[in-house]
Amino acid sequence: MYSLFRPLLFTCDTERAHDISLCTLDIAYHSGALPLLTRHPRPLPTTAFGLNFPNPVGLAAGLDKNGTHIDALFALGFGFIEIGTTTPRPQPGNPKPRLFRLTQQQAVINRMGFNNLGVDALVRNVAGARQRNGPLGINIGKNKDTPNEQASNDYRYCLERVYALADYVTINLSSPNTAGLRALQEEQTLRRLIGELREAQETLAAKHGRHVPMLIKMAPDLSDSDIDAAARVLNEMSVDGVIATNTTVTRPLLRQHRLASETGGLSGAPLLGQSTLVLRRLRTHLPETIALIGVGGICCGADAVAKMAAGANLVQCYTGLIFKGPQLVGECVEAIRRRREASSSGRASTQ
């Protein structure tokens, strides 16, 4: 069904197509027509950072920034949903146009700039959601006009606001579209910031009587030494998990494309190799107690398996959905299932 809808959708401006897709999804969900769009995957139970997931394939942050489509998105068969990025105060994001589709390359360049209605609006929307068929993650960031020296105040405020409703919280330090944000990944700055947020997490856990996992979302553009330094901090601070990775400011395989010079983060197929290398290096330097979510460039089941082979416990997709449609969810679940079954058969044959 999506293959019939996509050509019409791709005649629209990219950001308008995004809005139309979400509106259509909601209509299909509320009318009961959603089964015509996709087939729900069979369960593939997975456990990570103390949470149980019906399957290991989730939706990355960015599609539903304000938590207004939670019910419909879960109905597509995702094992978990991550909403946001949300900030303490509403902000409009960067001027339009700010979203560019590279159809042949199955890629997108965005410079959205954390456009959202603010954390209070998101909290109201989450409280009103009725269908949560898996864990709900909430991705939090700082406002554009908040200096890095005060960034911890923004993250702590959002953490306090969403803690009671989130199954896990992601600290977004890696969007390239908020000036200076990625500087928060520098070793000493990262250590101070995570230290403050871990203290807040422990205080909130005592207040609410439950531990909500805190994950850190990393950039793909770090050098090996920067990745290793970040891994040291993440291990020292005993974070619950890491998401690898966000979008890239480099342009792998796109140097001749007419949109390659557009400012912003690149996602989609060209990001797969780069993001998977970061994932693999993090897995090498982090203990198994710190779970990893692999995201970046997943456009088919084989891509999801590549993330798992590199050390991911879970995977997320977003840009691939634009080109493949919601059937990508089931394709990834089934590919990971086959990998698990093959691995189990291999172990059994050696015993």
From Swiss-Prot:
Give the co-factor note. Answer: Binds 1 FMN per subunit.
Pfam families in the cross-refs: DHO_dh
Q: Cite a GO CC annotation.
A: cytoplasm
Pathway stated in the Swiss-Prot or TrEMBL entry: Pyrimidine metabolism; UMP biosynthesis via de novo pathway; orotate from (S)-dihydroorotate (quinone route): step 1/1
Q: Give the first-level EC class, as a single word.
A: oxidoreductase
Provide the active-site residues from the annotation: 175 (nucleophile)
| UniProt entry keywords in alphabetical sequence | Cell membrane, Flavoprotein, FMN, Membrane, Oxidoreductase, Pyrimidine biosynthesis
Question: Where does this protein reside within or beyond the cell?
Answer: Cell membrane
Q: Which GO terms describe its molecular function?
A: dihydroorotate dehydrogenase (quinone) activity
Which reactions does this protein catalyse? (S)-dihydroorotate + a quinone = orotate + a quinol
Q: How does it sit in the membrane?
A: Peripheral membrane protein
Entry's Gene Ontology BP terms: 'de novo' pyrimidine nucleobase biosynthetic process; 'de novo' UMP biosynthetic process
Domain of life according to the entry:
Bacteria
Q: Which InterPro entries match?
A: Aldolase_TIM, DHO_dehydrogenase, Dihydroorotate_DH_1_2, Dihydroorotate_DH_2, Dihydroorotate_DH_cat, Dihydroorotate_DH_CS
Q: What is its EC number?
A: 1.3.5.2
The residues the record assigns to binding FMN are: 61-65, 85, 139, 172, 217, 245, 268, 297, 318-319
Which cofactor(s) does the record list? FMN
UniProt binding sites for substrate: 65, 110-114, 172, 177, 246-247
**HAMAP family linked to this entry:** DHO_dh_type2
* Subunit: Monomer.
PANTHER family, sorted:
DIHYDROOROTATE DEHYDROGENASE (QUINONE), MITOCHONDRIAL (PTHR48109:SF4), DIHYDROOROTATE DEHYDROGENASE (QUINONE), MITOCHONDRIAL-RELATED (PTHR48109)
Biological role stated in the UniProt entry: Catalyzes the conversion of dihydroorotate to orotate with quinone as electron acceptor.
Q: Which family does it belong to?
A: Belongs to the dihydroorotate dehydrogenase family. Type 2 subfamily.
Q: What is this protein's name?
A: Dihydroorotate dehydrogenase (quinone)
Organism lineage reads as: Bacteria, Pseudomonadati, Pseudomonadota, Gammaproteobacteria, Lysobacterales
Q: Which gene encodes it?
A: pyrD
